Design a protein with these regions (language model features):
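Short, glycine-biased loop/turn motifs at secondary-structure junctions and
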Residues: 1-169
């Protein structure tokens, strides 16, 4: 299983220093302990929402696993930290998750049909998704089929001031 983990810069999570590779702890309970991660990348933003001052990693949860009904959160006793995701990669993974799981909740910060970037990004899903943002913002789009929630098209762009202009839908 592949999952995602948000952290403070330097791979710090609630005061705990993680490292690349295998990290081990004794217990896993989503409410209290263990290494936490999420199956849906967007759920990381619920816990590490300051996108400009957080880091996001591709991880593999192992050992004892615990899940709860809050979101796609997972707690585990063994967490393999595989690699850091660049901002655009993070949102591409989020779009892929939506396409692979069209019936699942979209996760934190996914807007329906129309979104304005905030905190450096906008993720929008719908029949005719539109978004706008400031210079440097990342815009991620998931277009649904006309007759259902299946994702037909994914796209991602960065407002660069040349091909993609600021504050234009």
């Amino acid at each position: 299983m592949i999952a995602y983990k948000g952290m403070c810069p330097g791979m710090i999570c609630l005061g705990y220093q993680l490292k690349m590779g295998l990290n081990v702890t004794e217990q896993a309970n989503c409410q209290a302990n263990g290494f936490h991660c999420a199956a849906n990348p967007m759920d990381c933003l619920r816990y590490y929402g300051d996108f400009q001052n957080s880091e996001y990693y591709l991880v593999r949860p192992c050992g004892d696993l615990d899940e709860d009904a809050v979101d796609s959160r997972i707690s585990c006793t063994q967490l393999w930290v595989l690699r850091k995701l660049e901002p655009q990669e993070f949102f591409l993974h989020a779009l892929a998750y939506m396409a692979d799981h069209p019936q699942m909740p979209d996760g934190c910060d996914v807007k329906r049909e129309r979104a304005q970037a905030w905190n450096g990004y906008a993720v929008v899903r719908g029949k005719h998704p539109r978004a706008k943002g400031k210079l440097g913002d990342i815009l991620a789009f998931a277009r649904e089929a006309v007759n259902g929630p299946k994702i037909e098209h994914l796209s991602l762009c960065v407002i660069d001031g040349k091909e993609r202009l600021p504050d234009v839908w």
